[in-house]
Amino acid sequence: MLALEVVSLPVADVDRALAFYTQKVGFRLDVDYHPTPTFRVVQLTPPGSSCSVQLVTADSTARVSNLYLVTTDLAAERAALIARGVAVGEFRHKAPIDTWEGGFSAGLDAQRRDYASFADFEDPDGNTWTLQERGYRAP
């Protein structure tokens, strides 16, 4: 069996990113190991996730896009993030949902179907995240 354990996330300032992800987004700090002035490992985990994010200092142009965070209640999660100071975009939904053709329409999917509704935000370094609604977790 294979399991995805960690995704590396490039950041310019580890302390700023650590504050953003723990205080605003609500990630849990798992590791902050800083044995020397030039070596530091910071690992965070989203609530309910088995995959963590490791903050790594990188070239100032390095970015990760479209990291997905799933939730059973997109409206509530978006509101909670906004209340903590995260600039989250408006809701959008796949239209039509059953094909790669087409695009997106404004608002939540009227039927609240799994994998149909989204909202986006980015961290202070420009890494982008997509919140996606789904009511169940496939095994």
Region roles according to the model:
Residues 1-18, 64-67, 132-139:
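N-terminal beta-strand motif that seeds the catalytic metal site of vicinal oxygen chelate
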Residues 2, 8-51, 59, 76, ...:
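Core segments of cupin and vicinal oxygen chelate
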Residues 8, 45, 56-57, 122, ...:
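Residue-level detector of conserved, well-ordered beta-strand and adjacent loop positions
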Residues 13, 73, 123-125:
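Acidic active-site catalytic centers that drive phospho-/nucleotidyl reactions
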Residues 36-40, 61-63, 97, 113-115:
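Short acidic/glycine-enriched loop/turn segments that link adjacent beta-strands
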Residues 51-53, 65, 129:
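Short beta-strand segments
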Residues 55-82:
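Helix-adjacent hinge/juxtasegments
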Residues 69, 78-139:
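Vicinal oxygen chelate
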